[in-house]
Amino acid sequence: MKHYIRFDWAMKRLLRNKANHAVLEGLIGTLLNEKFIIKRFLESESNQQSENDKFNRVDFLAENEKGELIIFEIQNTRELTYFHRILYGVSKVITDYIDLGDDYDKVRKVYSINIVYFSLGQAKDYVYHGKTVFYGLHEPHDILKLSNKQSKAFFGDNIENGEKTKREAGDVFPEYYLLCVNNFDKLAKNNLDEWIDFLKNGKIK
């Protein structure tokens, strides 16, 4: 466990060094399969003096070209209410980045990436993705999609005449990524695996 604590604090230094932004953008881009440009950090309870402080984590906020926000967190001490804290963190960012008089379409899309170095629930895999899906109770294969007008207004999609958007209503809602680093115990087969291996062992192959 001592190795992970050292690496957690090394990541804190990495996050706060603007010269290393490309490294983190590479990790985020690999995970989400799209380009993100880091714009600013979230300064919160992450500035602790001890590895065992209550909020032992690394937080920063990144923004892409579309104005979407991403929260990045590292946690190496077990916490029973971790899922609740993730939910709170996303909710807080949503409310922090909208003004009182703004219309609801100004609510930002938020991604939450969480790297954990402890057993989380009954996890067997090492990467989990969570998102909101609206499906019909009477027609479970019917996934609720946006209208063409909503798709254009919210995502800037250009839809040809006669076509319907493939955007789901759930695409408006936050998405969550959980990287259970300790569950990774195999050879890296793709770029994402190489990142997980790096997060676990601190070595670049």
Specify the residue positions occupied by each region the protein language model found:
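Elongated, amphipathic alpha-helical interaction scaffolds
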Residues: 1-205
